[in-house]
């Protein structure tokens, strides 16, 4: 019975979230045309609405640990579900993503992605994809802010192993900026696919930045170790206190 109730709550949450996305995006579009800063405000308002509505509709609270970045910086984050995107954007001053070019063709996501300076990249052979990404980043570097990349290249369910891709190291080397790792446990509550969401407290943690100057291999090894340990620690906190998850 509890499962059925939670599933119904999850369905209600999903429906109202996408309705809110449509309404907020529609009314926010005119001011977002005027200035990029207004587009950031609209996007952040939606993200904050999602976390607020999740807390009372499905009983899913959110927690931010660590110090979010304030200046220009590369952010490399663990990606478990849409929720970690929401949480990172809600606390990052000027976020812009490395994202699949197909997403920019979507009416709402595409419009706001272009307004805040997200960088579309076509997927293909690894060497070609990296060259395309670096070229796109250089073209988009006129838009200051925090460039966000998911070094595993996809959403990864808790416990699954997916290698870290060299693209993150190539960006780190090309930009010459600090890279802030971000760990999370959100996949325990909000999965990669499906409607069902679990109650609890989902956490992301902004970890100490990795300073520029490391070679690619050393950087990628340190990045993976830092993010995986941080995420495993966050997940262990939840699992140790809630065996049902």
Residue spans for each PLM region:
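Non-catalytic C-terminal accessory region of glycerolipid acyltransferases
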Residues: 4, 130-245
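A generic structural signal for alpha->beta connector loops
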Residues: 59-61, 94, 115, 144, ...
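Active-site phosphate/pyrophosphate- and oxyanion-stabilizing loops and adjacent acidic/basic residues
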Residues: 52, 86, 169-170
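N-terminal membrane-anchoring alpha-helices
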Residues: 1-61
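Catalytic core of membrane glycerolipid acyltransferases/transacylases, capturing the structured
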Residues: 24-43, 55-57, 70-126
């Amino acid at each position: 019975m509890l499962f059925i109730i939670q599933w119904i709550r999850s369905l209600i949450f999903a429906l109202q979230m996408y309705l809110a996305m449509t309404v907020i995006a529609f009314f926010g579009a005119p001011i977002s045309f005027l200035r990029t800063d207004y587009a950031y405000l609209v996007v952040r308002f939606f993200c904050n609405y999602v976390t607020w509505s999740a807390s009372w509709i499905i009983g899913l609270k959110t927690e931010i640990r660590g110090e979010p970045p304030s200046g220009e910086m590369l952010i490399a984050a663990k990606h478990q579900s849409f929720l970690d995107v929401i949480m990172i954007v809600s606390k990052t001053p000027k976020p812009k993503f490395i994202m699949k070019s197909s997403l920019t063709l979507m009416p709402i996501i595409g419009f706001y992605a272009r307004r805040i300076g997200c960088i579309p990249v076509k997927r293909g052979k690894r060497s070609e994809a990296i060259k395309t990404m670096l070229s796109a980043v250089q073209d988009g570097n006129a838009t200051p802010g925090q460039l966000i990349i998911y070094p595993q290249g996809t959403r990864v369910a808790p416990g699954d192993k997916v290698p870290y891709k060299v693209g993150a190291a190539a960006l780190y080397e090309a930009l010459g900026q600090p890279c802030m790792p971000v760990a999370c446990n959100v996949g325990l509550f909000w999965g990669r696919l499906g409607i069902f969401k679990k109650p609890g407290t989902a956490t992301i943690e902004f970890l100490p930045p990795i300073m520029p100057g490391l070679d690619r291999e050393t950087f990628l090894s340190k990045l993976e170790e830092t993010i995986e340990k941080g995420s495993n620690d966050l997940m262990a906190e939840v699992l140790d206190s809630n065996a049902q998850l």
